[in-house]
Regions:
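Short, surface-exposed patches at the edges or C-terminal ends of soluble domains, predominantly
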Residues: 21-358
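Single-pass membrane-anchoring alpha-helices
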Residues: 292, 359-390
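General helical secondary-structure elements
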Residues: 341, 348, 382-383, 393
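Cytoplasmic C-terminal tails of single-pass
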Residues: 389-398
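Sequence-pattern detector for short linear motifs
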Residues: 7-8, 210, 389
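Hydrophobic secretory-pathway targeting helix
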Residues: 2-28
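Short, Lys/Arg-rich N-terminal segment immediately upstream of the first membrane anchor
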Residues: 1-3, 358-360
């Protein structure tokens, strides 16, 4: 039985590996949206340097047909709201499996507050917990800024998530990346309560880029959802904020990444390699980020299927052990039943002997009763014969 099980598992494993290897025989397609007011600043540099994927530009309404064949979708700081149909199309595409959606936001400075609202509507419609905070992240510390409090130098410090290859994001990165006038990331639970991802996490959350020694600015209403300026504002000390975060949907092997500023198209995108004298690892970070997404899309299905196979083998092994135990239990029950049957047979034989013995005894008793009855009849007869006859008085007188 063990040999058969190993053979079956081997065949299934080979089939899974072949399927997964062929599932992305074509290059990964990255689509960049420019149809919702996004700028294309630095996009040509990004596309020119990252050549291991196919690039596609979207300038029209987003529909299922437009997203057909797309593996990674970049929405770089859109300023025009997405329609309900577009949100549904993006959601259906994302949860079809093996997809990555990148959404970049803004701070609440100037028109950025409108972008925050529009993106949060998109995120809620898609079904992710991630949200943009309604505020700005600033610092007065010259070690984490590029000569202005709003030119934030942020740090690539991804969470180590086993099996999700997050180490790729930081490979070779030793310098900060620029986030010009950024917002930060928070998350919202099913009851509508907002949470601080620095202190509270949830299954599937991956924190990627951080701001340190910073504070919250509040430029336009409403006030920030999580980071009250009275606690996190200027003069309240140095604080940490999550600037890039992702939510991973393990059942679909899909990922959504939300950022407080964009890789491309904003005032000075994350691709920047230097800014106001600050040396940056922006290009390497962007390349690593896309490399991570490609790895997740192409290798994730194999990992997931191997995990499913391992679970199936464990379940099968458990079932076989249970069946073996049941067979052993049934064997013991059968042996006990055979013993009970033999015991009953012995009891029947004993009862039969007893009955036979009783039958002989009954026959003897019947003979004795008959003899006794005959003797009684004889005695009565003798007594009757011995009785004397009476003399007639009338005859004497005559």
């Amino acid at each position: 039985m063990n040999t058969k099980k190993i053979l079956i598992v081997s065949v299934v494993l080979v089939a899974i590996l072949v399927f997964a290897a062929n599932s992305h025989a074509q290059p990964i397609t990255v689509a960049v949206d420019l149809g919702h007011g996004e700028s294309n600043k630095y996009l040509s540099y990004i596309m020119g340097n990252i050549t291991g994927v196919q690039w596609r530009i979207i300038t029209t309404t987003i529909t299922p047909d437009v997203l057909k064949g797309v593996d990674i979708l970049l929405l770089g700081q859109p300023t025009v709201a997405f329609s309900p149909d577009e949100i549904q199309a993006i959601k259906d595409w994302l949860f079809s499996g093996n997809k990555v959606l990148y959404v970049a936001g803004d701070s609440d400075y100037g028109p950025g507050q409108k972008t925050i609202v529009q993106i949060n509507d998109l995120l809620a419609g898609i079904g992710t917990k991630l949200r943009l905070e309604h505020g700005s992240v600033y610092s007065d510390n010259p070690n984490v800024t590029a000569k202005a409090y709003y030119r934030m130098l942020t740090f690539v410090e991804p969470d180590n998530v086993p099996g999700l290859f997050t180490d790729i994001i930081k490979q070779g990165v030793t310098k900060p990346i620029l986030m010009h006038g950024p917002g930060c990331i928070i998350w919202q639970d099913a009851q509508g309560k907002y949470h601080d991802p620095v202190k509270e996490t949830f299954p599937g959350l991956i924190r990627i880029v951080w701001a340190h020694k910073a504070y919250i600015g509040d430029n336009t209403p409403p006030i920030p959802y999580v980071y009250d300026p009275m606690t996190y504002g200027k003069g309240t000390g140095d604080h940490d904020f999550v600037m890039y975060a992702a939510e991973y949907f393990s059942d679909k092997n899909s990922l959504i990444v939300v950022a407080g500023e964009s890789l491309y198209g904003d005032y000075e995108p994350a691709w920047a390699s230097s800014y106001y004298g600050a040396s940056l690892d922006g290009p390497l970070f962007v390349q690593n980020l896309i490399k991570w997404w490609v790895k997740l899309i192409t290798t994730g299905p194999i990992e997931r299927k191997l995990g499913d196979l391992s679970q199936s083998v464990s379940t099968l092994s458990g079932n076989l052990n249970q069946l073996s135990s049941q067979v052993s239990s049934q064997g013991s029950a059968i042996q006990k039943m055979q013993g009970d049957i033999q015991s009953i047979k012995n009891d029947v034989d004993s009862l039969k002997a007893t009955v036979n013995s009783l039958a002989g005894t009954v026959n003897e008793l019947m003979i004795l009763v008959i003899v006794e009855a005959v003797l009684i009849v004889v005695v009565l007869a003798l007594m009757f014969l011995r009785k004397p006859k009476a003399t007639s008085a009338t005859e004497v007188k005559k």
